[in-house]
Amino acid sequence: MLLDDFSLVAGLDDNIAFSESVELTMNIENVGAETSGDITATLIPQTQNVYMTSPVFDVDPVSSGDIVEVGPFAFDISTNVQDQDEIIFHLHIQDDQQSWEYPVSFNVNAPDYQLSSSFIFDGGNGSLDPGEIATVQLVLENIGSAALNYPTFLVYENDEYLNLGEISSDNAYYWDSGTSVVLSFEISVSENAPLGHSAISWINIGSLNTDYEFLFPLPVTVGMLMETFETENFL
């Protein structure tokens, strides 16, 4: 038995994206000289980013030279996959005499993010100084292969010298691939913060009423000027 071809349905197209339910139909051909026995076809995931919902199909004997459709196998893609992560399966075909196995793999489309620009509005020198309260504005681009519906944002840190306020966004509905959002939040720096002190804050990117979560790191350095941190990705 030879894996001849396959077709899939994922959402509204044939591109597999994060958190989608997918149906996969296989065409198998009997390239032998004799009719096969009763066949069992099983699609077995080899990666942890996919969950089978319909993994096994039984097929009547296949005559020599015939091609039959098997499926549709059904599976769900994990919500939290990286853009272009690979999902890998083994298709196991067995009759009463012998078995065959074929690898099948796909890449998954998902959002991904890049900091395009950042600004500090402090009414002064454009840097985060000890004892100062400033507004940080970030332009974040979706550089991935999929859009994010109803994006949500949280910002937090775990640092004794910094305190971050609530974050706001100019887009709460649909963040398409290749487009940007503008994020703003208030940051206060302790009077005791030493110049040059560095910390990592995090932007938690989510999607409303889903389990989607992407942690975007945001380095912060006290006393660094705009023209320096833009080059080095520091605030």
Locations of the language-model features?
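Extracellular carbohydrate-recognition regions
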Residues: 219-235
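Short, solvent-exposed loop/edge segments of extracellular or virion-exposed proteins
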Residues: 2-12, 118-125, 231-235
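Terminal connector regions
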Residues: 74-112, 188-222
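Short, solvent-exposed loop/linker segments at the N-terminal edge
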Residues: 12-20, 125-132
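Buried hydrophobic-core signal for structured, non-transmembrane domains
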Residues: 24-29, 65, 89-91, 136-141, ...
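Proline/serine/threonine-rich low-complexity linkers at boundaries of modular beta-sandwich domains
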Residues: 1-5, 106-117
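Intrinsically disordered, low-complexity Pro/Gly/Ser/Thr-rich segments with frequent PxxP/GP/PP motifs
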Residues: 51-81, 162-193
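Short acidic, flexible loop segments centered on an aromatic residue
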Residues: 29-50, 57, 141-163, 167, ...
